[in-house]
Amino acid sequence: MLFIRSLAFNIALYVNTIVQMIIWAPLYFLLPRKNAWFVPKFWAASCLWLHKILAGARAEISGVEHLPSGPCIIAPKHQSFWDTIAFLPSIPDALYILKRELMWIPLFGWYVAKMRMIPIDRGSRSKALRQAVKIGRERMRENRQLIIYPEGTRRPPGAEPAYKYGIVELYAQLQVPVVPVAHVAGLYWPRRKFMRYPGVIRARFLPPIEPGLSREDFLQRLIRETEAACDELLLEAARSPNHPPLPPTAIARIEELKKDRS
């Protein structure tokens, strides 16, 4: 049954994406950029609904009140495709940093281009970071919310923190609050895996880190607060009845936490 539900959801996800891009295209490209935001937000919400109905995984997102009313940086953990869509309905005017190659995909790339995201060449990290800072500063004047994954790539729940320098430089240069986001969605929607596991996927927007800290103080605070919240969510998920399979990184981290608290 789990395989069938996973298969049904994976097929529905792609079909839903393609169909919505085609159906909404005439209206989406005619509307002004901000007015057109309801289309990707509706798509993201519909994907979460399909995930709930077909795979049995319900999203429960808290702490949205911590989002500043003006420009900010949102820094979620990156474990799954789930965290690229789940927060979109909650963010007023999201701004993503993405690989420039995604802009070359027919139709999808046009959708992204309309929202004026930040495409970068990941082959040159220093150049990509300078470009992200330059364009990010321009977009901040439009009261947008920049989403960046501090660890860069997807990592399994419980893995050792591996935060990159990019988030630090953006914090220092853009001088806006940073809102960490904790979750363990990788338990339910694992990276590079076919199976989708049922349960409640809890995510939490944490209180913002205001600008003004030194680079090192900011990084240590970001890691400390994000990882502490992720640890709590991991323990909560592991204690839940019929919890999803725990990857080795999650098992090892839970054992560490138990020792520390004993």
Please report, for each region that a protein language model flagged, where it lies by residue:
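Catalytic core of membrane glycerolipid acyltransferases/transacylases, capturing the structured
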Residues: 21-41, 45, 52-54, 69-125
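Glycine-rich helix-loop-beta junction characteristic of Rossmann-like nucleotide cofactor-binding loops
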Residues: 63-67
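Non-catalytic C-terminal accessory region of glycerolipid acyltransferases
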Residues: 3, 130-262
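Short acidic-hydrophobic, aromatic-tinged amphipathic segments that line or gate anion-handling sites
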Residues: 61, 118-121, 211
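A hydrophobic membrane-anchoring feature enriched in long, contiguous, low-charge segments
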Residues: 4-29
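Generic preference for hydrophobic
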Residues: 61, 74, 96-97, 203-205
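Membrane-helix interfacial anchor on the cytosolic side
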Residues: 55-61
